[in-house]
Amino acid sequence: MTATIAPPSLSGQPPKQRPSVIETEGRHGEAHRHTDALRGLLRAARPHQWIKNATVLMIPGLGFYTLGVAGLVDALVACSAFCLASSSVYLLNDTLDREADRHHPVKRHRPIASGVVSPTLATVASGAAALTALALGFLVSPMLVAIIAAYLLLTASYSLGLKRLAWVDVAVLAAGFVLRVVAGAVAVGAAVPLLLLTAVFAGAAFVALGKRRSELVLLGDDASSHRSAMGTYRLRTIDAGLAATQAVAVVTFGLWVLALEFEPAGAGLALLGAAGFWEVLNAYRRRLMG
C-alpha cells in the first residue's frame, strides 16, 4: 500500500494543517461557555430589579421643575450608581449563598448556584460594580460617595451574617431603601423629610415581611434549612408585623403629604394618593393571605 504524499506548496513552505473536527468543536464549545457565562452574569446582576432604585428619584422628582439640567443629571447619576451598587450586592449575596440556593426549588436555577457563572467571575464583577458605583458618586458629591459606601457596607453585612437574624434582616433591607431616598435628596441638595423616610422604611419592611411570609408558606418546615432566620419567624408574628408596618407606612405618608404646601385642590389629590397607597398595600397583603 503506497502512502499518499501531499504536494509541496508553491511557496516552498510545508502545507498548513487544517484544524481537526475535535479542535473546531472544542473552540466552539469554549466560545459558547464564555457567552453563557456573560449572559448568566448579566442575569445574576438582576437588571430587572433596578426599578427599586427609582426611589432615588423620589425627592428629585418632587422638585422636577426647579432642578435644572445639572440637578437632573446629578439625580440620574445617583440612580445609576445605586443600580450598580445593588447589582454588586446581588452578585456577592448569590456567591455566598450558592450552596444553600442549590437546595431551593427556585433559586437553584440562578446562574451562580447552577454553575453557569463561576464564583470567581461573580466576585470580580461584584467588586468592579461597587468601585464604579463609588466613582459615579464622586462625580456628584463626596456625601453621595459616603451614602453609597454605607449602603454597600450595610448590604455586605447583610450577606455576611445579618440575614441570619430574624427581623434584623427585614430592618436592614428597609434601611437600604431609606439610604436610596437620602441619596436622591443629597444629589440635588434637597432636605430629607423624616416623615417620608419613616414611610419608606415601613413600606419596605412591609414588602420584605411579605416575602418572608411567602417563603415560609412555600418551604414549610424546610424554610430554616435554606435561611436560618426563617426558623424564628412564625406566620402569626409576620402577620402582626404586616399590619403594623402597613399602618405606619400609610399614616406617616399621609402626614408627610399634609405637611406639603398645596392648594386646596392639590391637597385633595394628595390625600387621594395616600388612600391609593393604602389600597396598594392592602391588595398586596390580601394576596399574601391567599
Please provide the spans of the model-predicted regions.
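Generic alpha-helical transmembrane segments of integral inner-membrane proteins
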Residues: 54, 58, 76, 80-87, ...
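Short, aromatic-rich membrane-interface segments at the entry and exit
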Residues: 70-75, 142-148, 166-168, 191-197, ...
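Topogenic membrane-insertion module of multi-pass membrane proteins
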Residues: 2-102, 116-128
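Multi-pass membrane catalytic core of lipid/isoprenoid biosynthesis enzymes
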Residues: 98, 103-148, 194-204, 240-252
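Acidic (Asp/Glu-rich) catalytic motifs at the cytosolic membrane interface
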Residues: 85-113, 162, 168, 209-217, ...
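Cytoplasmic-side transmembrane-helix entry/capping segments in multi-pass membrane proteins
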Residues: 166-176
